[in-house]
């Protein structure tokens, strides 16, 4: 039987531009009813989001999930902190990484897997301005080689 591909909802393209992604990790998200309905409608923005470890729990901060239009008075706060569902050893490892200088834990993608919302979080090290220029230069060189030789 053919496996159904994960249903990609949102992607943080700015993360690959601003960070060197060292490793990735999949986590579940604790959501309310109107939040999951808004996510299914693809009304989520990951651009300024980050993960913070507080008292042994991981939280997704500053991720904007728009209010559900039929949610009336039961709607959620668009920028509230959302708990990530991870094992204790994963949270402990992320807490150690978060304590290091220059390391950030950021959301890369949000997708639906078997009906549940999942977030792919990445451990990244911030790029300097010259690193960004080198990345652009390398991309242009690769594009030129591909255009010239058809590799």
Swiss-Prot record:
PROSITE patterns: SSRP. It is found in: Cytoplasm. NCBIfam families: PRK05422.1, smpB. HAMAP family: SmpB. PANTHER family: SSRA-BINDING PROTEIN, TMRNA-BINDING COMPONENT OF TRANS-TRANSLATION TAGGING COMPLEX. Required for rescue of stalled ribosomes mediated by trans-translation. Binds to transfer-messenger RNA (tmRNA), required for stable association of tmRNA with ribosomes. tmRNA and SmpB together mimic tRNA shape, replacing the anticodon stem-loop with SmpB. tmRNA is encoded by the ssrA gene; the 2 termini fold to resemble tRNA(Ala) and it encodes a 'tag peptide', a short internal open reading frame. During trans-translation Ala-aminoacylated tmRNA acts like a tRNA, entering the A-site of stalled ribosomes, displacing the stalled mRNA. Belongs to the SmpB family. This is SsrA-binding protein. It comes from Lactobacillus gasseri (strain ATCC 33323 / DSM 20243 / BCRC 14619 / CIP 102991 / JCM 1131 / KCTC 3163 / NCIMB 11718 / NCTC 13722 / AM63).
């Amino acid at each position: 039987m053919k496996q159904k591909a994960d249903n990609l909802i949102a992607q943080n393209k700015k993360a690959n531009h601003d960070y060197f992604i060292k490793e990735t990790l999949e986590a579940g998200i604790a959501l309310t009813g109107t939040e999951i309905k808004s996510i299914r409608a693809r009304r989520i923005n990951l651009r300024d989001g980050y993960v913070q470890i507080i008292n042994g729990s991981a939280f997704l901060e500053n991720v904007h999930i728009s209010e559900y239009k039929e949610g009336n008075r039961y709607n959620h706060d668009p920028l509230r902190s959302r708990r990530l569902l991870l094992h204790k050893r994963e949270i402990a490892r992320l807490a150690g990484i978060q304590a290091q200088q220059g390391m950030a834990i950021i959301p890369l993608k949000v997708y639906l897997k078997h009906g549940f919302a999942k977030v792919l979080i990445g451990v990244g090290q911030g790029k300097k301005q010259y690193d960004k220029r080198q990345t652009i230069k390398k991309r242009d060189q690769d594009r030129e080689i591909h255009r010239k030789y058809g590799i």
